[in-house]
């Protein structure tokens, strides 16, 4: 039955850090709370875990109310049947891998030793650490320590998995591998999961659904592909990936940029004459061509001037002054500051934000 959160509120002093947040997580679904520091995502997670006392709203896990301030309900963390992986691994340095994983079952006191040993073997096999059961944390890599924390979170067959920025202490390459491992394990076990991060790549690659948060409220939620390609809010477009924005006005026939350049985009994105909107252009859909190149009819072209550049290895990142705005584009072609260029893109790659987004 997953997780149900309705009108969750958390207040610290005079600050409302979580303000009427509502969402559901279905069985087997992986939902990410994504947002900048201070947006309320970790506080929301801690309320789900029972580590914070909510000031309003309700939280249900597997159909059972675990938090409802109006009814005086606050079920303790140890009674919520959840597993949690923290930003810091939080594993005991004096215990072996097996002992760390067994610890949650041992403190419950009601599980026979043989059953604990079997559960530990199962959890370590799931995370691929069964051969390292007798090692101590000091003998493990950072990625292996994080897998110990994950094994400990799943050993009790929890109803819910919670992740509080678990990859932030890993290097980039190890982060990618561990990200894939967490996704595999969560899907294999079909446990509803809530994952907190400020990292857009983690949110997009791991999630069935992403909830974008800012200043304690939900800005927008949806499937990763939809939020990236067709966001309904400017904040989402800015926060998820690199985006360029162009002011557009509909003249009755075509959309025009601030300098009058025509941008002929699909009819379903048209509006009434005089309406002003913003167009979102992702860096990767833009091509940078010399100004004298003959253009095909499949692409829209805007004339611009290179104002800055940074060599990034696979590509060069160009800052190009176009239509009274500066846009960022990636290209393997070589230009210098001051070059006149054409920035080209396909009509279907333009996304017009709704009015007042």
Q: Which residues make up each language-model segment?
A:
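The feature captures the beta-strand-to-loop junction immediately N-terminal to the Walker
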Residues: 34-36
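Helix-to-loop junction immediately C-terminal to a conserved catalytic motif
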Residues: 49
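Conserved A-loop
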Residues: 10, 22-25
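Glycine/charge-rich catalytic "coupling/switch" loops of P-loop NTPases
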Residues: 254-308, 334-357
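Conserved coupling/switch loops of ABC nucleotide-binding domains, chiefly the family-specific signature
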Residues: 55-58, 215
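ABC ATPase nucleotide-binding domains
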Residues: 81-83, 87, 91-235
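Conserved ABC transporter NBD signature motif
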Residues: 57-69
């Amino acid at each position: 039955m997953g997780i149900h959160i309705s009108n969750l509120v958390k207040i610290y002093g005079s600050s409302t850090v979580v303000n009427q947040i509502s969402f559901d997580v279905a069985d087997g679904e992986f939902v990410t709370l994504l947002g900048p520091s201070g947006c309320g995502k970790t506080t929301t997670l801690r309320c789900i875990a029972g580590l914070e006392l909510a000031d309003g709203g309700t939280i249900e896990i597997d159909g059972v109310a675990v938090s409802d301030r109006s009814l005086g309900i606050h079920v303790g963390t140890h009674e919520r049947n959840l597993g949690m992986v923290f930003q810091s691994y939080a594993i005991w340095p004096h215990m072996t891998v097996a002992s760390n994983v067994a610890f949650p079952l041992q403190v419950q006191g009601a599980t026979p030793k043989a059953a604990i040993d079997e559960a530990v073997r199962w959890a370590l096999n799931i995370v691929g650490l069964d051969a390292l059961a007798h090692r101590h944390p000091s003998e493990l890599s950072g990625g292996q320590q994080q897998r110990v924390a994950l094994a400990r979170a799943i050993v009790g067959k929890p109803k819910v998995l919670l992740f509080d920025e678990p990859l932030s202490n890993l290097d980039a390459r190890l982060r990618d591998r561990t990200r894939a491992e967490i996704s595999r394990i969560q899907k294999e076990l079909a446990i509803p999961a809530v994952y907190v991060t400020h990292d857009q790549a983690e949110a997009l690659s791991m999630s069935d659904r992403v909830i974008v948060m800012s200043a304690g409220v939900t800005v927008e939620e949806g499937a990763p592909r939809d939020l990236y390609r067709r966001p309904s809010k400017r904040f989402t477009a800015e926060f998820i990936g690199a985006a360029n924005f162009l002011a557009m006005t509909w003249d009755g026939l075509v959309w025009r940029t601030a300098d009058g350049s025509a941008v002929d985009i699909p009819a379903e994105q048209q509006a009434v004459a005089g309406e002003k909107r913003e167009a979102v252009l992702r860096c990767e859909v833009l091509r940078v061509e010399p100004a004298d190149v003959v253009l095909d009819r499949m692409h829209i072209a805007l004339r611009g001037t290179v104002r800055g550049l940074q060599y990034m290895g696979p590509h060069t990142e160009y800052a190009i002054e176009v239509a009274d705005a500066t846009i960022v584009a990636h290209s393997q072609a070589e230009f210098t500051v001051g070059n006149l260029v054409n920035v080209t893109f396909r009509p279907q790659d333009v996304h017009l934000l709704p009015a007042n987004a």
